[in-house]
């Protein structure tokens, strides 16, 4: 291969973004190839949907596999390029020979005689070009790790923003349901109601401030991550000798980035005790509200759609990270009028659905949770985070998850369903009044985990 052909070949191994030999190259949908870090930095600058920097076509796939062949060729091209290893700084003072070897144990450049000395004889040594490529591989892994932290922080920041707006809406809803519940009480509790509303307002303001502070911390952390990522990326492109002399503290920096990663706020409001509420509810208590017959089922609590599958169908349910093998228990009777109250122990499971729904107990009556004539309080656990919500429409409940008995109150004639934390004597949530058109039966579904 003559020099012109060699130059053409080498040009095919150069990323058009950073104008350096490819490092961790990926080939996107249109067929053009780039360094993965270059694409990451482009996407971080807001170029979404991602367009090819060469032909401007939109790339549908967010993640790409490394082009292994291109990676190997680029590595070979780097190792064959001229290296300024004969500079005075790279001459061994003791033996006056060029340092052409790298000691992995001591992270030092050595000349031949030094590598054979008693101090280094037992260590592993490799040529500078090969060692530099190994170092770049380690840098790429550290960059991948940094990018994971970056993406996790960005997701947390987006979630924090959604939580801020969601909490604002929830506080307004909670004020209304507290006021409605006090209006139902047989005794006048105006002062207690005002204390609860004022306490709710104070707690909410504190949580809003925490969420705003958290968003600032996450934004600052993202900027630090981006700077660190870019710094490592630039380090990958420095000459081999300089690279090997600057490799010591990379892991320490990325470990520090992980330790300094801001954690999202988990907002939780206090549900205050309402004087006499349990005494009032117990006037309508239903004994043995739930049947003793348990039906195997599968519950999915994903963000897209929440559903329950009964009988053998649950064995073929699609794989779902938020799916839980469960058991369902229906009420012993359906209600068509009157007021009814019962309590259910939720101690044994983190994932459960409790409430009332249309009277449909056949094994093939699979249903979507967020649909009409279903009024549920839902507890779910994802990773180490517990969430409490209601359905129709889906609404996160920013109050502490009940750990013992949960009370369910159905006022059929007035079209209302409410949930209470029995241990606290407090209101969890009350659905807005509606008009029921069919018999309603108690329902409880609890996960096996």
UniProtKB/Swiss-Prot annotation:
Zn(2+) binds at residues 92, 95, 114, 120. Residues 269-449 form the B30.2/SPRY domain. A zinc finger (B box-type) spans 87-128. A zinc finger (RING-type) spans 15-56. SUPFAM superfamilies: B-box zinc-binding domain (SSF57845), Concanavalin A-like lectins/glucanases (SSF49899), RING/U-box (SSF57850). Keywords: Coiled coil, Metal-binding, Zinc, Zinc-finger. One of its GO terms (cellular component) is cytoplasm. It comes from the Eukaryota. CDD domains: Bbox2_TRIM43-like, RING-HC_TRIM43-like_C-IV. Pfam families: SPRY, zf-B_box, zf-C3HC4. GO terms for molecular function: ubiquitin protein ligase activity; zinc ion binding. InterPro entries: B30.2/SPRY (IPR001870), B30.2/SPRY_sf (IPR043136), Butyrophylin_SPRY (IPR003879), ConA-like_dom_sf (IPR013320), SPRY_dom (IPR003877), TRIM/RBCC (IPR050143), Znf_B-box (IPR000315), Znf_C3HC4_RING-type (IPR018957). The keyword Acyltransferase does not apply. SMART domains: BBOX, RING, SPRY. Residues 189-225 form a coiled coil. GO terms for biological process: innate immune response; regulation of gene expression. Belongs to the TRIM/RBCC family. This is Tripartite motif-containing protein 64. It comes from Homo sapiens (Human). The gene is TRIM64.
């Amino acid at each position: 291969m003559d020099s012109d052909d060699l130059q053409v070949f080498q040009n095919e191994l150069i990323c058009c973004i950073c104008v350096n030999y490819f490092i961790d190259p990926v080939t996107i949908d249109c067929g053009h190839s780039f360094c993965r870090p270059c694409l990451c930095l482009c996407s971080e600058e807001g170029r979404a949907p991602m367009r090819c920097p060469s032909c401007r076509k939109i790339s549908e796939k967010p993640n790409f596999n490394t082009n292994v062949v291109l990676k190997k060729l680029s590595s070979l091209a780097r190792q064959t390029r001229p290296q300024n290893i004969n500079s005075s700084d790279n001459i061994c003072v003791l033996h006056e020979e060029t340092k052409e070897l790298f000691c992995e144990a001591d992270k030092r450049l050595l000349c031949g005689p030094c590598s054979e000395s008693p101090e280094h004889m037992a260590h592993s040594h490799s040529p500078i070009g090969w060692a530099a490529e190994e170092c770049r591989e380690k840098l790429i892994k550290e960059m991948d790790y940094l990018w994971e932290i970056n993406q996790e922080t960005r997701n947390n920041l987006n979630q924090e923003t959604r939580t801020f707006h969601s909490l604002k809406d929830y506080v307004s809803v909670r004020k209304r349901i507290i006021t409605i519940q006090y209006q139902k009480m047989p005794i006048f509790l105006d002062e207690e109601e005002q204390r609860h509303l004022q306490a709710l307002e104070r707690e909410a303001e504190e949580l809003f401030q925490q969420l705003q502070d958290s968003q600032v911390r996450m934004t600052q952390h993202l900027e630090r991550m981006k700077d660190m990522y870019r710094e490592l990326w630039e380090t990958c492109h420095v000459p081999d000798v300089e690279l090997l002399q600057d490799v010591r503290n990379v892991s320490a920096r990325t470990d520090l980035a992980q330790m300094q990663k801001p954690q999202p706020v988990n907002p939780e409001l206090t549900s205050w005790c309402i004087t006499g509420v349990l005494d009032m509810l117990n006037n309508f208590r239903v004994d043995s509200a739930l049947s003793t017959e348990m039906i195997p089922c599968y519950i999915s609590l994903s963000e897209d759609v929440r559903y329950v599958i009964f009988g053998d169908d649950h064995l073929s349910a699609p794989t779902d990270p938020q799916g839980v093998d469960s058991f369902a228990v229906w009420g012993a009777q359906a209600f068509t009028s009157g007021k009814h109250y019962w309590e259910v122990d939720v101690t044994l499971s983190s994932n459960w659905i409790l409430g009332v729904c249309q009277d449909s107990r056949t094994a093939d009556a699979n249903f979507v949770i967020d649909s009409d004539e279903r009024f549920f309080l839902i507890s779910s656990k994802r990773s180490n985070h517990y969430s409490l919500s209601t359905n129709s429409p889906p609404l996160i409940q920013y109050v502490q998850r009940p750990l013992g008995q949960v009370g369910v109150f159905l006022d059929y004639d007035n079209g209302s369903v409410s949930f209470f934390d029995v241990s606290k004597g407090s209101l969890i949530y009350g659905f807005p009044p509606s008009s029921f058109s069919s018999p309603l039966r108690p329902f409880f579904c609890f996960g096996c985990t």
